[in-house]
């Protein structure tokens, strides 16, 4: 467990963003990438390690997509030759004044410990410290926000379709959603591979505060810079009232996730921070 000996912030820092999906990762990327000492490259979500190791996440088929777009072509080279991925970010950190780079891909939350070790080793070979970031959101709120995003993309967002889509989601419990909701797995994997002081693990509901942002900057070994608190990125809001029976189904589905967070971060007041999950995730066994 832990990083390679002898690496210091003089080499810069690589941020490995592991989500969770719909838990502030787009806002996080926007704030970090706007720093003068940061360069996150040509994508926010590179989807390399999930494409290579998590076919169930649905990103492996991107290998077959058109190579006409430069971004797609460059990404294919990373997948075909993963060493290029590490070399690319190392090259960004060699630019004058750049101390921070990274890949913030929410589906990385499902990566296995052995994959995290390989990522860690790839940057250790280049003497670059890696700092994982994992943000968790009220699991019921997160799924509701995810479903709204999907319906909005399809131009089908209204009260009736939202309620019915959530009802169907509770019945099907698809793997792609479960992968991104398993906070317990991500916490376990991070604990197995990294030292506690190498990780920034917090809640979406606490992210937008000076104290949380200062802690993040400390973990990343960069000076504190005030983010744009008012910037909104990929916000999913409606006035739809979700029926209690669906909230109960979501609570039953997400109870193991809630239990894992309580066990790991029991010092937090989840009744106040995650009111929906606290009310509806009643079976923590």
Label every PLM stretch briefly.
Residues 111-133:
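ATP-dependent NMP and nucleoside kinases share a basic, alpha-helical "lid"
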Residues 82-89, 116, 120, 187-188, ...:
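Generic structural signal for well-ordered alpha-helices
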Residues 71-72, 103-109, 165-179, 234-248:
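Surface-exposed cleft-lining segments at the edges of enzyme active sites
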């Amino acid at each position: 467990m832990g990083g390679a000996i002898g690496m210091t912030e003089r080499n810069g820092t690589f941020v490995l963003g592991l989500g969770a999906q719909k838990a502030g990762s787009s806002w996080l990327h926007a704030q970090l990438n706007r720093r003068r000492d940061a360069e996150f490259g040509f994508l926010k979500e590179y989807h390399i390690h999930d494409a290579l190791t998590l076919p169930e996440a649905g990103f492996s088929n991107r290998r077959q997509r058109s190579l006409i777009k430069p971004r797609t072509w460059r990404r294919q080279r990373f997948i075909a030759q993963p060493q290029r991925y590490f070399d690319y970010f190392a090259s960004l950190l060699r630019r004058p004044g750049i101390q921070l780079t990274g890949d913030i891909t929410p589906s990385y939350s499902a990566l296995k410990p052995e994959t995290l070790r390989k990522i860690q080793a790839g940057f250790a070979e280049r003497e670059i410290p890696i700092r994982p970031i994992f943000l968790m959101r009220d699991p019921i709120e997160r799924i509701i926000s995810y479903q709204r995003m999907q319906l909005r993309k399809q131009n089908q967002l209204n009260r009736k379709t939202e309620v019915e889509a959530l009802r169907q989601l509770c019945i099907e419990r698809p793997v792609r959603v479960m992968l991104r909701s398993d906070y317990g797995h991500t916490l376990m994997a991070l604990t197995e591979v990294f030292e506690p002081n190498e990780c920034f693990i917090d809640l979406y509901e606490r992210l937008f505060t000076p104290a949380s942002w200062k802690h993040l900057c400390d973990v990343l070994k960069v000076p504190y810079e005030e983010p744009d608190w008012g910037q909104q990125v990929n916000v999913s809001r409606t006035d739809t009232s979700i029926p209690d029976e669906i909230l109960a189904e979501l609570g039953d589905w997400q109870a193991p996730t809630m239990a894992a967070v309580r066990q790991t971060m029991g010092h937090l007041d989840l009744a106040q921070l995650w009111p929906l999950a606290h009310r509806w995730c009643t079976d923590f066994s």
